């Protein structure tokens, strides 16, 4: 089961995602990112985009994945309310394939909150917790 939460971080807000798998934690942190911007519960899966990134480590993979989603938001005005992720180990690191579904931002419907300017490595962590769940977190630049 994936879930996310926002946490206090000095003048910013952190995004932390949990999942029973690494993929679910990445999905949850992506949804948490968009929930900083809008009410994701009101986003319908009208349009889908596929994202594919490859990186040497999990932190770089998370960064690149979230950056691709933010670029889609900035370029096409999309907000996402559903994300499915597949991660595979490769010879050189990791490969992520994702399908993100949502719709064009409608201020009356989606209740805009904060504007995320950029993805950062600030306070980024990805770890398997003692209870077996995965956690991924970072602090976006608002």
From Swiss-Prot:
UniProt cross-references to SUPFAM superfamilies, sorted A to Z: MTH1598-like
Annotated keywords: Calcium, Metal-binding, tRNA processing
InterPro entries, sorted: Archease, Archease_arc, Archease_dom, Archease_dom_sf
Pfam families in UniProt: Archease (PF01951)
Keyword Metal-binding: yes
Binding site for Ca(2+): 12, 141
GO biological process entries: tRNA splicing, via endonucleolytic cleavage and ligation
GO molecular function: calcium ion binding
Domain of life from the UniProt record: Archaea
Signal sequence segment: none
Protein task: Activates the tRNA-splicing ligase complex by facilitating the enzymatic turnover of catalytic subunit RtcB. Acts by promoting the guanylylation of RtcB, a key intermediate step in tRNA ligation. Can also alter the NTP specificity of RtcB such that ATP, dGTP or ITP is used efficiently.
Annotated family: Belongs to the archease family.
Entries under NCBIfam families matching the protein: PRK00407.1
Protein name: Protein archease
Taxonomic placement: Archaea, Methanobacteriati, Methanobacteriota, Thermococci, Thermococcales
